[in-house]
Curated annotation (Swiss-Prot):
Protein role: Catalyzes two activities which are involved in the cyclic version of arginine biosynthesis: the synthesis of N-acetylglutamate from glutamate and acetyl-CoA as the acetyl donor, and of ornithine by transacetylation between N(2)-acetylornithine and glutamate.
A GO biological process held by the record: ornithine biosynthetic process
GO cellular component: a single term: cytoplasm
Residues annotated to bind substrate: T158, K184, T195, E282, N405, S410
Subunit and interaction comment: Heterotetramer of two alpha and two beta chains.
InterPro entries, alphabetized: Arg_biosynth_ArgJ (IPR002813), ArgJ-like_dom_sf (IPR016117), ArgJ_beta_C (IPR042195)
Predominant cellular place of this UniProt entry's protein: cytoplasm
Residues the record marks as site: Involved in the stabilization of negative charge on the oxyanion by the formation of the oxyanion hole: T121, G122
Biological or metabolic pathway of the protein: Amino-acid biosynthesis; L-arginine biosynthesis; L-ornithine and N-acetyl-L-glutamate from L-glutamate and N(2)-acetyl-L-ornithine (cyclic): step 1/1; Amino-acid biosynthesis; L-arginine biosynthesis; N(2)-acetyl-L-ornithine from L-glutamate: step 1/4
Enzyme class: transferase
Active site positions: T195
High-level lineage: Bacteria, Pseudomonadati, Pseudomonadota, Alphaproteobacteria, Hyphomicrobiales
Record GO terms (molecular function): glutamate N-acetyltransferase activity; L-glutamate N-acetyltransferase activity
Name of the protein described by the UniProt record: Arginine biosynthesis bifunctional protein ArgJ
Amino acid sequence: MALEISRLFPQNIQELPSLSGVRIATAEAGIKYKDRTDLLFIVFDKSASVAGVFTRSKCPSAPVEHCRISLPHGVARGVVVNSGNANAFTGRKGKQTVDTIICAAANALKVKKNEIFIASTGVIGEPMEASSIVNLLPSMAKTAKEGNWLEAAKAIMTTDTFPKLATRRFDCGGETITINGIAKGAGMIAPDMATMLSFVVSDAAISSQMLQSMLSEAVQESFNSITVDSDTSTSDTLMMFATGKESFPCITSKTDPRYEVFSKQLRALLHELALQVVCDGEGARHLIEVHVIGATTDNTAKIIALSIANSPLVKTAIAGEDANWGRVVMAVGKAGVEVDRDLLTIWFGEHRLAINGERDPEYCEEKIGAYMQNKHITIRVDIGLGTGKATVWSCDLTKEYVMINGDYRS
């Protein structure tokens, strides 16, 4: 099914710079899609340190299980990614498929099996044959080339309507460092982690322990703060790799001043990728930004913000460009944390709609109606009980979302 490109499509798709020793190949494996690439092979010519964050679903895919087992080894030489089949809930055969692909990739690169990582995205519960992937890996290992990031982002798309890429180039301790990232995701997007798949590579030298610390911290304000439909995928995978410039001494401690410099840039890059995922939410026509302030703690603020952002009634109101702030009140009330109805204040953009538990006396339907036609809608709620605050991002819920997911397997 051909999908209309999201109206929240970024005006300019970034061109990502090449990273020395990072080679990329894509291919058409015919797993589900015809006449498009659906297989990605990232090759590291030298050992790269690795970190990862994965789904908290209790039904994780076979690729996720493999990555969790291999991650403590701390070294990566290759990543195999396919779209069209999640290889999730596929039992023993799914694990055998992963093992077969891992062995083939390791043989193609002449490296250890625990230095190969794998990710899959697509339909859940359908067995996946390894042969269509395995047969392509030897030639892909030979033809992989530096650059090719746009093609990499395209190869991992499923219901995405545009490829998602971001890059940062900055000074870190007197050395110019680059971070490149790609992501995919449009549906089945909810926190913990979450996007469906994302891969980030830097030429900095960072120990796997510090890389894991940076990634785990950075994900909280990015992929763990977005939601499209409140559904957490079985396959969510965010992995980061650091190849290590020889001229850049390795970061091995949080006390290294470069740790925070790098972390700041990583947070910005992940935030950019996460917003691209939300902007490509299936059928999305509005980006929704939810700010909650005045909660008892930051954690309760985030719970309330997610309750608002995940509410089908709030999301459909935004889709209909209807400032139905009563649905925000409903979402706050059902969050299950401490609130006081008579202290609530609600804004849509700069328009205050409710104050101290009732409609604002200066409420103007005409003014707020004009605001609701914007592509980017901001909802701000003051709980009035403390200093806790949180921000999450979501998108509206449209008829197109139902159509896309109703036809997903056809």
